[in-house]
Amino acid sequence: MSSKLVLVLNCGSSSLKFAIIDAINGEEYLSGLAECFNLPEARIKWKMDGGKQDAELGAGAAHSEALNFIVNTILSQKPELSAQLVAIGHRIVHGGEKFTKSAIITDDVLQGIKDSVPFAPLHNPAHLIGIDEALKSFPHLTDKNVAVFDTAFHQTMPEESYLYALPYKLYKENHIRRYGAHGTSHYFVSREAAKVLNKPVEELNVITCHLGNGGSVTAIRNGECVDTSMGLTPLEGLVMGTRSGDIDPAIIFHLHDALGMDVASINTLLTKESGLLGLTEVTSDCRYVEDNYETKADAKRAMDVYCHRLAKYIGSYAALMEGRLDAVIFTGGIGENAAMVRELSLKKLGLLGFDVDHERNLAARFGKGGNIAKDGTRPALVIPTNEELVIAEDAYRLTA
């Protein structure tokens, strides 16, 4: 067995994803999800040695109980896995301006993550809990914990991309600017695209679309991010599962002044009650929207708005490619599986030379990627993302 094993942790506010990955060859020895934290139904499920298992964590369980279960129950079944761990990689949603790349976790790094809590109030506190619990659970790896930031890849954006047209002192004094998200995924699929297209990364011009319950589009020119659709927070940009994406900011004042909604209620509306859920009034699940597009008005409405917004972003980012666009890339749960989203969106972009092959598009689902465009037209690639591998690679590289 390899001695390049890394434990990857992705702590959310009410869940914890985990995996043990060989950082050299990408082999996955363990993967799982603990969820429903602080609720009676808190539970954990995992895959190891080709088998699937699950268990209850106990009412009210959270990150501490989940990590204890991973260490004392799951890994006790395979002590050689635990013995061969060389590092722990932590996904961190927001690193502010301080972090342009992954970093070994020190007191200074922890402070930087804390300083970014206002920009990711649900995610960063959970990451800090996960780091603390990992340090307790794996004391022999205290100096081998690495933070991998979702925002780091976007730190190459030029000023004209990341500044808002607000009073400049809000940026200078309060760091209010665009940061983006999903950077680890955009980084991974762009590097995979370079291999597919047989181009050096530093010459690669692509537009990457990470589409899941959250979604973002990134313009990558000469291998570096030059713009991305998410902003100060992950609320800006595309239509998402429950998030509105771009709106006229004055809608907020109207909701407050004319409809009497308070700030907390407006925040809930924009982040948890909008997007596909708001448009269908039924669900945030894109599968419902796709399955019922031809027969239900709510599904058609949601799909059309979703694809219109996505096509607008792809089209506008094409203008940043300095005359050469190598491909558009789809990834994430929706990007990898929702053939209708890809086809309807690219159908609006014939001006850019996209022409989807219907059969290829249908075939590129459920873990299968490939070029879904017709021969002789601009490539449209489906590339399954692997953020966990990037986190494992960075953790191993920094601690080896």
UniProtKB/Swiss-Prot annotation:
It is found in: Cytoplasm. Signal peptide: none annotated. GO terms for biological process: acetate metabolic process; acetyl-CoA biosynthetic process. Its cofactor is Mg(2+); Mn(2+). Mg(2+). Can also accept Mn(2+). ATP binds at residues 17, 210-214, 285-287, 333-337. GO terms for cellular component: cytosol. Keywords: ATP-binding, Cytoplasm, Kinase, Magnesium, Metal-binding, Nucleotide-binding, Transferase. Pathway: Metabolic intermediate biosynthesis; acetyl-CoA biosynthesis; acetyl-CoA from acetate: step 1/2. Substrate binds at residue 91. It holds the Pfam family Acetate_kinase. PROSITE patterns: ACETATE_KINASE_1, ACETATE_KINASE_2. Its EC number is 2.7.2.1. Mg(2+) binds at residues 10, 387. The record marks 182, 243 as: Transition state stabilizer. It comes from the Bacteria. Catalyzes the formation of acetyl phosphate from acetate and ATP. Can also catalyze the reverse reaction. NCBIfam families: ackA (TIGR00016). Homodimer. This is Acetate kinase. It comes from Pectobacterium atrosepticum (strain SCRI 1043 / ATCC BAA-672) (Erwinia carotovora subsp. atroseptica).
